[in-house]
C-alpha cells in the first residue's frame, strides 16, 4: 500500500530532472540521478502491479513515462529527440540512462505500446556500446580491447557494464525462449576483472587510477553474467574472494 501511495504521489511532480542539467542548452532532462529514479520506479511498479486497478496502472504508467521514460530514452536513444551519443560524458552515462530507461520501459510495456517499442530500440542498440571504437577528435579510446579489458578503471567500468547487464537480464526474463543478441565482450569480462585485482590476505584490492577506492570490486557484474549463463571458474574464484 505504501509503494502504491508513493507512486501515485510522485507522478504529480512537474519534473524529476536536476536544476543544473535543466539549465543547460540544450536542456538535459536525464542524468545519472534520473536514471536511478527510473530504475527504482520500475521495481516499485512491478512490485505493486497486481494490486493496482487497471485505471491506476494506466495513470502511474503515464506519469512515469512523462517523468522518467521520455527523458531517459528521449535524450539518450530515440530520434528525433536524442541529443546524446555513445561518447557523451563518460561512456557509462549512456548505459545508465539508456538501460535504466529500458528497464522502466519493460515494466510499463503492458500499458504503453510505445514503452515496448522503446525497450526494443535500447535492446538493439546495446551491442553498439560494447563495440564503441573510440573518437579521435575527442581523444576518446575504444571502450574494450581485444582481450576484454576496458579503458575505465574498475569502479567506473563495473558501473557502466552493470547497468547494461541489468537491462539485458531484464530483457531475457521478459522474453523467455528468445535467444539474446550476442555480445562477444561479455565472455572476456571475468578475465579483465581478475587481472586488475590484487589478491592479498584479507579483503580483495584492485588497481585503479586514483579515481576510486582500492576496495571496490566487480562482483555485481559477474553475478549478472552468471545469471545469464555466462560462467567460468574465474568468476567463482573472484566472487569467493569478495565474499571472504
List each language-model region with its residue ranges.
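Aromatic-lined, polymer-binding surfaces characteristic
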Residues: 1-198, 202, 210
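N-terminal leader/propeptide and maturation segments of large enzyme subunits in energy/redox metabolism
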Residues: 206-244
